[in-house]
Amino acid sequence: MRNLGVWIEIGGLQTYVGRIIGEKEEDARFSYAEEYLSGNIARPISIHLPLSANAFSVDDTRNFFEGLLPEGFTRRCVAGLLHTDANNYLSLLAGLGNECLGAIKITDENNEVVNADYQKLTIDEVSQLAREGAMETAELVTKSHLSLTGASGKVGLYYDENNKDWYLPKGSAPSTHIVKQSHVRLDGIVTNEQLCMMTAGNMGIEIPESFIVNVGDGRDEEVLLATKRYDRAIKDGLKKINGLSVPYRLHQEDFSQAMGISAHNKYESDNAGYLKMMFEIIRQKSFNPIADQLKMWDICIFNYLIGNTDNHIKNVSLLYDEELKTVRLAPAYDILSTVIYTSSTRDMAFSIGNEYDIKKITRDSFRREAANIGLGEQMAMKRFDYLANAFPDALNKACDELLGKGFNKAIDIYERIRDRRREFIS
C-alpha cells in the first residue's frame, strides 16, 4: 500500500493538503484532507483538481502528479538508482518529491527524513557537472531528492549571487536555479537556448533570467545553462540555512496538468485543439486574461519564428501568487530552435490554423488560428506583423551580446537559424 502525503507552500508555510493512496499506481487516487478543505486557506492545487471531498480518479491523479517527474532517459536512470520501475510514478514521487517544480512537496512515511541543507560545490564539481552525462546528473537528482520535469539533463541548484557560489540543496531545501547540461546529440544546445531566450526578451516577451556558466573554453562539454526559477523568490527576513536566505516557493502547473492531459500526450494529434483549450483556461482563470492571452499569442508566434517545434503543453505554465489566490501565465521557458538539428521534426507540437508542418504554416495560418481561439483578427495579426518584423534585429542583437561575452558558438547557431528560416518561412 502506498500512502504519500501531499503538501503545498502557502505564504511561505508548508501546508498539508491531502494524500495519494493505493495498492499500486493502477489504483492510486488523490484526495484532499478534510482538515484542509475546512480551513480558511484551502485552495486547489490544480485547475483540474478543484476542491472536493471526493477522491479523484486514477487518471486525474496520475496526470497531475506524474507531471512533476522527469521524463525520458533521466527518468529511467533515476528509476534504476531508486531500484524501481520507470513506470512506477508513486515510487519516483516518494524518492524525488522533497523539491518539485512549483510549491508541491511529497512525503513518504517510510523514507528517512533528510534535513534541509545546502552543500557548497567546488569549481571542480561544477566543471564535472558540465562534462558528465545524463546518468551522472540523474545520480545528483536522486541524491538531492529533487524532481524537475523534462527529458534533458538538468538539476536544481542554489546560486549565491553575491559570492558567485553554487550549492546542492539537500532534503527539502529549495533551489534557486535550474541548471542544464549540453546534449551529446544536439550540438550547441546551451548556446542555442540562451540565444533564443535573449532574442525573445529583446522582443518584449517575458522570460526568466538566464546565463551561460562557462567552466572552460566555451566548448559544449564546458558550458551549462543556468535559469533563475520564477517559482522561487527571496525576500528580506527569510529563514537562513548556513547563512543563505531560503527562498519561498510559488506554485505553478504546466498546461498538461491544468488540462488534465497525460504527459505522454503532450504533443497534439488529430487537431485536438490544444491551443484553443489553453486560451480558454487563460480566459477563465487568469487574473489578467486580456494581457495573458496576448502574451500566449506572442509566445506562439515566437516559437514559429525561431523554429521551435518542441513547443508542447508541458513547456507553457501557469504561475500562482504566494497565497494561491490568483494565477497568471508564467514567463516563457525551454525555447530553442529545434529545426536547426536534422534529427528534429518539422511538425509543431500543436496545430496552427490546422497545420502542423512548420514549412506549411503561413501568416494566413495564424489568421485562421486567431479566429479559432477567439482572438480579434486585427489585433492578432498586428502582433504577428510586429514580431515578424522585429525578429531579425532581435536575433542579431542577442548574437552580438553573446559574442561580446566570448561565446563564439553563437554565430554558428545564428547562421543556422537564419538559414532554416529562409527555408521554412517565405
Please annotate each region the language model reported.
Residues 1-313, 317-426:
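Phosphate/dinucleotide-binding and metal-coordinating scaffold of catalytic cores
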